[in-house]
Amino acid sequence: MTQQEMKKIAAQAALQFVKPDTIIGVGSGSTVNCFIDALASIKDEIKGAVAASKASEDQLRAMGIEVFNANEVAGLDVYIDGADEITPQGAMIKGGGAALTREKIVSSLAKQFICMVDSSKQVDVLGSSFPLPVEVIPMARSYVARQLVALGGSPEYREGVVTDNGNVILDVHNFNIYEPLKMEHTINNIAGVVTNGIFAQRYANIIIVGTAEGAKIIK
């Protein structure tokens, strides 16, 4: 079974957490694309969605699903997204698609974070197989890079990428993260950092793993 097929299995299983007559939070990325495709089958049962990226907004609208601004809602029942890496405790690295800041904002509005992954994204230690994205205000890029080196990482400027917020991304390689919550706060305290791709403060409440045997749900 291909990775794409496993993503579709996880995305289909996530529909069970969507309650009728609610506005849901939707992330971004390849697994979320599969979820939005699946969501179209029950679009008449929900009020709409708040999207974490322009790309997801466009896809939702193309499916005929109403898109709300984050400032229009007081809270969300669920936020549904993928991850680049996830631990058994629900801590994640996200931001491969450069939408990490908006993903943090929308996920913070939700009572529950539902994370959809295929089995290749499961790790014991964050940073083991995927670099950590850090969104940075452009003028602070070099300063932030030096601070990340001091923390033990190897930052690389993601050339040609500008976030939906007009900022740049540094991808931090060779960076095993043994204390995700502490490191999330440490990096966010560097002047010029908008946010980083560690999701430990807002961890996943439910993990859906797409496998060849079907969807495995971890609560």
UniProtKB/Swiss-Prot annotation:
Annotated substrate binding sites: 28-31, 81-84, 94-97, 121
Gene Ontology annotations of biological process type: D-ribose metabolic process; pentose-phosphate shunt, non-oxidative branch
Cellular component, GO annotation: cytosol
Pfam families the record matches: Rib_5-P_isom_A (PF06026)
InterPro entries per record: NagB/RpiA_transferase-like, Ribose5P_isomerase_typA_subgr, Ribose5P_isomerase_type_A
Catalysed reactions listed for this entry: aldehydo-D-ribose 5-phosphate = D-ribulose 5-phosphate
Keywords noted in UniProt: Isomerase
Coiled coil location: none
Domain of life where this protein originates: Bacteria
MF-aspect GO terms: ribose-5-phosphate isomerase activity
Enzyme Commission no: 5.3.1.6
Complex formation: Homodimer.
HAMAP family found in the cross-reference section: Rib_5P_isom_A
PANTHER family: RIBOSE-5-PHOSPHATE ISOMERASE (PTHR11934:SF0)
Family designation: Belongs to the ribose 5-phosphate isomerase family.
General function of this protein: Catalyzes the reversible conversion of ribose-5-phosphate to ribulose 5-phosphate.
Descriptive protein name: Ribose-5-phosphate isomerase A
